[in-house]
């Protein structure tokens, strides 16, 4: 397929819209590389994969593809022995998580019997590396930061580091609390300069604290000093930070080495996930356009029902039926230049490119489109200023190139064929070019405003005329395509509507030859009759649709009634059973106690009475109630006919009858697949309206149950408050009436912060310090509402 044609028909704009539905750069890249296929089997497969994606979207609403990243460059670095940073490792882990989720997601669909031959096979290729995924999950977070859980050594280093930092802060805070602080310090804050904790000291008091000056303010009035008392602690902190960095590098190198053993598997998983993203993007794009999967023809047959141009406003675009390849292989659309004829050409051409690219098309169900080896288009003014060619020469150069390449598997779209030269010669050339195109076996749709070509559709058995309807009242085209009706001149009617004198119009009519006038009158009459027939057909179809809907609604209500009845009976039975089981358990306990009393010598308790009471209790259990099976209303046996909608019982799939092979067998179209099916395996159905899918989301808790106490000792202030917030949620979910928060005694800063936070928590009823046995004021007891 020529790139030039893709540009003329604006296929690049379709691809740009399609990229908006991709979830990753991998999906976007696949879309950018998308091109129409010409092999019929390939087109079938790409259409089927899109249909399977659409089926999944209908059933589940979405697929777990979020989090997919292009990691091919990371894998290349591993291949040459390099190490990855934390973010790169996280991205590989994210892809492994998406691989596992996608495989489980697909397995769930396949287990409930959803037919997904292509996507099912694709998911089978995904390899789940759960251990590798989990190792990454406990080692790095989504920002690429290495977690404390990555190694015991790192956890110990960071714990020691936090304690050291707390000691530094506590020492510096003592300076801030000093009674002379307001006099000697510019501000009562602890800050950091050169990665060391400092306090802002006024210039005149710099000798009071000793230590090291790390910075000064712009005015020079404030010095940022590290007091001598914390120099050693800060040095210790720096040493711990160096150890932390060293341990992080070791962890990243270790994980990189372990990932290097799985390069091929991760590479393949990422490629497969990119395919999934691309396929789901096609499916979501089709859903947004209200598009359908077309039937495919390998014989040049096109039958588009209510086809719409996908780049025009969906609320305003006029849908048209376009058919070609059965009764005729050439359509000549005649009429004035303002009639929207070019839109018809572009609609057919663009929908062909979309279908051959595996995309659904904006048309109605049961539309058929042909798979062509070549699509040629001579549309618009492609005049080349560099070559100094005229409009006519430019078009003719293009047409010559087309006729050299065309074959019987080609679709040619000619816009204003023969224009740009003398009308008589132009019309003659147009006829000759159409004949030459037909002789090559091509399917052709051409537009022209030459009246001489109106006769072409009548004089050639392989051709038909068409036109775009024009509304004389509004002086504008309706953009409705009328196949079989040639375009007519509206000059006299338009002139009259615009106020031209009737005398002038009458004189003009007299100058037109009788044959032309009669032809225009005939075309006008034909248009009126066609419009009337279409109106009556639509009304009849609407009435039939209404009757079908009434029948379906009635059958649905009957089914719902019986289902509701059975559900209520089942609920009542289950409730009764629960009550009896509870009573039975209580009775068993009483009987057990009575037997104990009997053994201990109690009088008046007889064994046979206990057995009899237990038997009566067992008989009190409700019996299973048989569900009502609703019987479908009896209908007269249906005589199958071509075009009937049917259900293939053995497959559980819907299809359409194509033709009868024998009394016992039919050819059935199921999606894009044609199959031979036994008549006994068919059930007649009416097409149903698409039902809105209700998406049910289940939320499951995971992880270990919350403990009844939270130990914050050794935690930094900010980290501690975050842990308290998370812990309270977990404790509430676990149902604890009260919990203990251990913060230690220390300076009281952490205790004060925790207390203030708890006072403002909406689920906390009361707080108190622990009793002596509970830990004293180093523990806060929290009671929930």
From Swiss-Prot:
Gene3D superfamilies found in the cross-reference section: 3.30.1370.110, P-loop containing nucleotide triphosphate hydrolases
UniProt keyword Transport, yes or no: no
InterPro entries documented for this protein: DNA_mismatch_repair_MutS_C, DNA_mismatch_repair_MutS_core, DNA_mismatch_repair_MutS_sf, MSSS, MutS, MutS2, P-loop_NTPase, Smr_dom
Alphabetized Pfam families for the sequence: MSSS (PF20297), MutS_V (PF00488), Smr (PF01713)
UniProt-listed GO biological process terms: mismatch repair; negative regulation of DNA recombination; rescue of stalled ribosome
PROSITE patterns named among the record's database cross-references: DNA_MISMATCH_REPAIR_2, SMR
Enzyme class label: hydrolase
Protein family: Belongs to the DNA mismatch repair MutS family. MutS2 subfamily.
Name assigned to this protein: Endonuclease MutS2
Species per Swiss-Prot/TrEMBL record: Listeria monocytogenes serovar 1/2a (strain ATCC BAA-679 / EGD-e)
Gene: mutS2
């Amino acid at each position: 397929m020529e790139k030039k044609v893709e540009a003329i028909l604006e296929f690049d704009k379709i691809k740009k819209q399609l990229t908006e539905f991709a979830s990753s750069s991998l999906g976007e890249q696949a879309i950018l590389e998308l091109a129409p296929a010409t092999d019929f089997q390939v087109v079938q497969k790409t259409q089927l994969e899109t249909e399977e994606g659409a089926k999944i979207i209908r059933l589940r609403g979405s697929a777990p593809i979020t989090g997919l990243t292009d990691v091919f460059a990371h894998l290349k670095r591993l291949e040459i022995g390099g190490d990855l940073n934390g973010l790169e490792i996280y991205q590989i882990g994210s892809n492994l998580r998406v691989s596992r989720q996608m495989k489980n997601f697909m397995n769930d669909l396949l287990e409930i019997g959803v037919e997904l031959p292509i996507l099912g096979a694709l998911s089978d290729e995904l390899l789940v590396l759960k251990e590798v995924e989990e190792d990454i999950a406990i080692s790095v977070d989504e920002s690429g930061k290495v977690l404390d859980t990555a190694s015991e050594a790192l956890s110990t280093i960071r714990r020691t580091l936090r304690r050291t930092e707390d000691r530094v802060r506590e020492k510096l805070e003592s300076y801030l609390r000093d009674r002379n602080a307001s006099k000697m310090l510019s501000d009562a804050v602890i800050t950091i300069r050169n990665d060391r904790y400092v306090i802002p000291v006024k210039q005149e008091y710099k000798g009071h604290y000793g230590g090291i000056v790390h910075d000064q303010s712009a005015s020079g009035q404030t010095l940022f000093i590290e007091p001598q008392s914390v120099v050693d602690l800060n040095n210790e902190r720096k040493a711990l930070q160096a150890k932390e960095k060293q341990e992080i590098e070791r962890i990243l190198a270790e994980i990189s080495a372990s990932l290097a053993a799985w390069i091929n598997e991760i590479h393949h998983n990422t490629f497969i996930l990119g395919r999934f993203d691309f396929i789901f993007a096609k499916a979501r794009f089709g859903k947004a356009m209200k598009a359908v999967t077309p039937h495919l023809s390998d014989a040049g047959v096109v039958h588009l029902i209510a086809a719409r141009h996908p780049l025009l406003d969906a609320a305003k675009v006029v849908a048209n039926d376009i058919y070609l390849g059965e009764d005729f292989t050439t359509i000549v659309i005649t009429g004035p230049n303002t009639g929207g004829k070019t839109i018809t050409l572009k609609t057919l051409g663009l929908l062909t490119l979309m279908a051959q690219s595996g995309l659904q098309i904006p048309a109605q169900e049961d539309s058929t489109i042909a798979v062509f080896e070549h699509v040629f288009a001579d549309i618009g003014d492609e005049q080349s200023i560099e070559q100094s060619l005229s409009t006519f020469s430019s078009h003719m150069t293009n047409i010559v190139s087309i006729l050299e390449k065309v074959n019987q598997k080609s679709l040619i779209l000619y816009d204003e064929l023969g224009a740009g030269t003398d009308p008589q010669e132009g019309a003659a050339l147009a006829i000759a070019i159409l004949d030459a195109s037909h002789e090559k076996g091509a399917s052709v749709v051409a537009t022209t405003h030459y009246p001489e070509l109106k006769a072409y559709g009548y004089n050639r058995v392989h051709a038909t005329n068409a036109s775009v309807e024009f509304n004389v009242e509004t002086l504008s085209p309706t953009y409705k395509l009328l196949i079989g009706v040639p375009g007519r001149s509206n000059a006299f009617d338009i002139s009259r509507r615009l106020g031209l004198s009737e005398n002038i119009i009458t004189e003009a009519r007299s100058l037109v030859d009788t044959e032309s006038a009669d032809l225009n009158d005939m075309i006008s009459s034909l248009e009126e009759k066609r419009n009337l027939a279409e109106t009556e057909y639509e009304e009849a179809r609407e009435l039939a649709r209404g009757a079908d809907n009434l029948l379906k609604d009635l059958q649905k209500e009957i089914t719902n009634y019986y289902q509701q009845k059975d559900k209520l009976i089942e609920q009542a039975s289950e409730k009764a059973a629960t009550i009896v089981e509870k009573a039975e358990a209580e009775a068993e306990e009483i009987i057990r106690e009575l037997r104990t009393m009997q053994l201990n010598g109690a009088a008046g308790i007889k064994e046979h009475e206990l057995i009899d009471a237990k038997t009566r209790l067992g008989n009190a259990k409700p019996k299973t109630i048989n569900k009502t099976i609703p019987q479908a209303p009896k209908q007269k046996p249906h005589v199958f006919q071509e075009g009937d909608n049917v259900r293939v019982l053995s497959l559980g799939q819907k299809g359409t009858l194509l033709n009868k092979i024998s009394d016992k067998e039919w050819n059935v179209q199921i999606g894009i697949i044609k199959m031979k099916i036994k008549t006994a395996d068919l059930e007649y159905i009416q097409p149903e309206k698409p039902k809105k899918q209700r998406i049910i989301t289940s939320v499951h808790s995971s992880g270990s149950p919350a403990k009844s106490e939270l130990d914050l000792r050794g935690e930094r202030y900010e980290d501690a408050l975050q842990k308290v917030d998370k812990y309270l949620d977990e404790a509430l979910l676990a149902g604890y009436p009260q919990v203990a928060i251990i913060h230690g005694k220390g300076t009281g800063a952490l205790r004060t912060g925790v207390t203030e936070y708890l006072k403002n928590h909406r689920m906390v009823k009361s707080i108190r310090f622990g009793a002596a046995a509970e830990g004293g004021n180093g523990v806060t007891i929290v009671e929930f509402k």
